[in-house]
Amino acid sequence: KTLPHHDNLKSFGACFGVSGGYERPMWFALDGEKAEYEYSYNYQSWYPSAEYETNNTIKNVGLFDLTPFSKFEIKSEKAHSELQKICTANIKNEPGKCVYTHMLNPDGGIETDLTVVCLEKNHFRIISSAATRERDKFHIRKYLSKDIELRDITDNLCVFGLFGPKSRELIKTISKENFENN
């Protein structure tokens, strides 16, 4: 599958790879570079681009396309209590609250790491790795009560992540929401 904005990404020099069933940018060619892999056991052709992107994100802000990440929803009167049983962190049942957490296996080992977002009371979106979509879906269903539906909405939504020390400055220019820690 390609992303909805594939052609736009390509026009900006994206070099694509596959992850989680999606063709997605792995890196962006710098001016004058070819947006293609030159495979080698030595210095990789994409190292300068990756270094530039990393440094820019560390010092400023970077926009990352996370559309292939797995996305699930549960909505039920018992949704919050069910998530409290299967997640290691305290899940907030308040709209807009977002919690990074883990799910464990019976031996106490980490099965997956994920983010749980409360959309409205007892209605949650769960976001996890693109590469572990089916495994995570199986694991979550295994521990949810059978009367709670887990919907896979991965292919229905685009997701972007804004990272870096200047990310809040940028998001304030496009949203009236409060993104401060509180």
Where are these regions (language model features)?
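Glycine/proline-enriched, intrinsically flexible loops and inter-domain linkers
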Residues: 1-182
